[in-house]
UniProtKB/Swiss-Prot annotation:
The gene is PRPF38B. Residues 292-321 form a coiled coil. GO terms for cellular component: precatalytic spliceosome. It comes from Homo sapiens (Human). Residues 256-284, 328-344, 422-450, 496-510 have a biased composition (Basic residues). The keyword Acetylation applies. It is found in: Nucleus. It comes from the Eukaryota. The modification Phosphoserine is found at residues 5, 288, 290, 318, 320, 448, 473, 475, 481, 527, 529, 534. The keyword Acetylation applies. GO terms for biological process: mRNA processing; RNA splicing. The modification N6-acetyllysine is found at residue 227. This is Pre-mRNA-splicing factor 38B.
Amino acid sequence: MANNSPALTGNSQPQHQAAAAAAQQQQQCGGGGATKPAVSGKQGNVLPLWGNEKTMNLNPMILTNILSSPYFKVQLYELKTYHEVVDEIYFKVTHVEPWEKGSRKTAGQTGMCGGVRGVGTGGIVSTAFCLLYKLFTLKLTRKQVMGLITHTDSPYIRALGFMYIRYTQPPTDLWDWFESFLDDEEDLDVKAGGGCVMTIGEMLRSFLTKLEWFSTLFPRIPVPVQKNIDQQIKTRPRKIKKDGKEGAEEIDRHVERRRSRSPRRSLSPRRSPRRSRSRSHHREGHGSSSFDRELEREKERQRLEREAKEREKERRRSRSIDRGLERRRSRSRERHRSRSRSRDRKGDRRDRDREREKENERGRRRDRDYDKERGNEREKERERSRERSKEQRSRGEVEEKKHKEDKDDRRHRDDKRDSKKEKKHSRSRSRERKHRSRSRSRNAGKRSRSRSKEKSSKHKNESKEKSNKRSRSGSQGRTDSVEKSKKREHSPSKEKSRKRSRSKERSHKRDHSDSKDQSDKHDRRRSQSIEQESQEKQHKNKDETV
């Protein structure tokens, strides 16, 4: 954002000359201060930025803490102009460290864990860096930056101006900006909480030669540019302070200027109307008299502030004493109360323990009774199950007996039926066999009769023939005797074969007929005996005939 003040806008040569004249006049009136480098009109009033145009080349941790800070989001958001931001710096800034005191716990940590390069855990970002980023959001012009670094009211305004240059300007231009201020002897305390006082010149030499600034880093300077800066700093050693009256006078002047520039001006956060704003056109019309008047007013105001601070200190001391007594009394009361409470707690604990023991005993009794009841119920259930099993067994046995009896009855009935059937079959078979045996015996008698008749007839015929043939030769008788012997040999073999066939038939019949009576056997034997007798008779008859 551009500055809204009409006095600081414009790029004409007369305005530059007027600003330079006003700066020289203020330096003459206020004592030895910083010398302003010449600003040529050819450079223009627009100040280009170097590096990242959104982050101002700040450490990401610091930038995120700035953007999330309520101070930056609420209070600094209301400041719209360059002069309002300068007044805020005058009243609020007391150091130029990036973090407030005690907000970052880095004790005992080293390296990257210690947050030396800004990568550790964040803390409360300082007011100075919030205002520095607010200046960056305003997009300052060259004239406004020169007004910051040559400001006479507060060294912290100048320090933030130099820091703005270090973060936003090219490394090749840093020497041109800082060269005329390297011997500036104005003091300021740069550390949060105090304890690190240095001059503006020492701070600028640190900006040019070191990258680290407390727990953050400046933008890196290229190696050739850094070597050039180091050589030029060697040619510009630090000046020794003057001795004698001139040194004393200069020290007195610096003391007066430090008092007038001290940031702890007033308890109110608003800007004092008596304080000069900056080296601008407001001081062109006034002279040394107006500046002296402002100095007198400032001294008076500082004296009143000191008195008010001393009163406040006295009040604080008295309050601290009263608070100490009150604390002691309250501590004694608290001790008494704590003792009584501890006693009450002990009594309550005892009562609670007793009640717990009683409850536990009751619970144990309940558990015992419950276990007993459950045991009795289990025994009853077991007895019931045993009785049921016995009943089931008895029922099963009865059913098995009935089933067996039924089976036996059925088998007996079946056996009776089978026996009756077998008897019927045996009777029918015996009848058939008897009938067959009778028919066979009849046939055998008939055959035997016919055979006997035939034999008798043959015997008669043979006897006749024998008688007729006896007269024949004895040779024929021999042949006949041989033939008869052969016949006799053949006849028993035939009988044996017949017997074998009959025995086979009998065995076959026995296999097929399992239940035959003895009557059948007797019949067979009789028939066989009859047949044998008939055969024997035939053989005898043959022998007799022979």
